[in-house]
Curated annotation (Swiss-Prot):
<feature type="active site">
    <location>
        <position position="26"/>
    </location>
</feature>
<keyword id="KW-0961">Cell wall biogenesis/degradation</keyword>
<feature type="binding site">
    <location>
        <position position="213"/>
    </location>
    <ligand>
        <name>Mg(2+)</name>
    </ligand>
</feature>
<dbReference type="InterPro" id="IPR036424">
    <property type="entry name" value="UPP_synth-like_sf"/>
</dbReference>
<comment type="subunit">
    <text>Homodimer.</text>
</comment>
<keyword id="KW-0573">Peptidoglycan synthesis</keyword>
<feature type="binding site">
    <location>
        <position position="77"/>
    </location>
    <ligand>
        <name>substrate</name>
    </ligand>
</feature>
<dbReference type="GO" id="GO:0016094">
    <property type="term" value="P:polyprenol biosynthetic process"/>
</dbReference>
<dbReference type="InterPro" id="IPR018520">
    <property type="entry name" value="UPP_synth-like_CS"/>
</dbReference>
<comment type="similarity">
    <text>Belongs to the UPP synthase family.</text>
</comment>
<feature type="binding site">
    <location>
        <position position="26"/>
    </location>
    <ligand>
        <name>Mg(2+)</name>
    </ligand>
</feature>
<keyword id="KW-0479">Metal-binding</keyword>
<feature type="binding site">
    <location>
        <position position="194"/>
    </location>
    <ligand>
        <name>substrate</name>
    </ligand>
</feature>
<dbReference type="GO" id="GO:0000287">
    <property type="term" value="F:magnesium ion binding"/>
</dbReference>
<feature type="binding site">
    <location>
        <begin position="200"/>
        <end position="202"/>
    </location>
    <ligand>
        <name>substrate</name>
    </ligand>
</feature>
<feature type="binding site">
    <location>
        <position position="31"/>
    </location>
    <ligand>
        <name>substrate</name>
    </ligand>
</feature>
<feature type="active site" description="Proton acceptor">
    <location>
        <position position="74"/>
    </location>
</feature>
């Protein structure tokens, strides 16, 4: 589906609840430190917040929820923390697969998962396959993901098609780039929420959030709940999205 068409769809529905919400889940480590606990306990409590966000998304008829779980820069963290995160990811997949099916959720991972061990890769593939035909909420987990990586991979695929004579270089446009991104078949992101008090994007969905509304909260991710999610939605609905245009009351 062409990005231009999808963006037009968002424009027509911009006064309603967002269709696609993306969340930068920040603050797990700080939450644990404030509680006098080790960092991994913050990540475990953050898993509870993930389930809350999913429940809210279903209850409010959101079409797509994308969660930034592990960036390509997170490999710079201590090895024991990375190991614990991978184990938590595997545990979440193994324990929640029934709920994904029960609630008609389509599960998808965006990012380079080839760096993960085979057991985790197999669990990801299984979860994606078994939920592929589900028609409810689309749940994207960005794992070993970076916005620059996503764009580079898209460009590589385009170059390959040009070299093979499948694509005319003079017919490359914005829609072409979007078509080969990891989110190619999805609606553009309407709303980006970042928890933890920082006000930056951190290499997340750089192409896809060109016209997104941004919502920042000081709440640390483990403390995120349906009330905070609703506040972000209310903020989104109250805004006038211009998509590069001007205010309606201006002449």
């Amino acid at each position: 589906m062409q990005y231009k068409y999808l963006l037009e769809y968002n424009k027509k529905n911009h006064e309603c609840n967002p269709c696609h919400v993306a969340i930068i889940m920040d603050g797990n480590g700080r939450w644990a430190t404030r509680q006098g606990k080790i960092r991994i306990m913050g990540h475990k409590e953050g898993f509870r917040a993930v389930k809350e966000a999913i429940k809210f998304s279903i209850a409010n008829n959101l079409k797509i929820l994308t969660l930034y779980a592990f960036s390509s820069e997170n490999w710079n963290r201590p090895l024991f923390e990375i190991k614990a995160l991978m184990e938590l990811f595997l545990f979440a997949l193994d324990t929640e697969i029934k709920n994904l099916k029960k609630h008609n959720i389509r599960f998808k991972v965006i990012g380079d998962i080839t760096c993960f061990d085979k057991k985790l890769q197999n669990s990801i593939h299984y979860a994606e396959q078994i939920t592929f035909d589900n028609t409810g909420l689309i749940l994207n987990i960005a794992a070993n993901y970076g916005g620059r990586w996503d764009i580079i991979e898209s460009v590589k695929k385009i170059i390959n098609r040009v070299q093979r004579g499948i694509l005319d270089v003079n017919k490359i446009h914005e829609n072409t780039i979007s078509q080969y991104l990891s989110t190619s078949e999805l609606l553009p992101v309407d709303l980006v929420i970042r928890t933890g008090g920082e006000k930056r994007i951190s290499n997340f969905l750089l192409w896809q959030i060109a016209y997104s509304e941004l919502y920042f909260t000081d709440v640390l991710w483990p403390d995120f709940n349906c009330h905070i999610f609703q506040h972000a939605i209310d903020s989104f609905v109250s805004r006038e999205r211009r998509f590069g245009g001007f205010k309606k009351n201006k002449k």
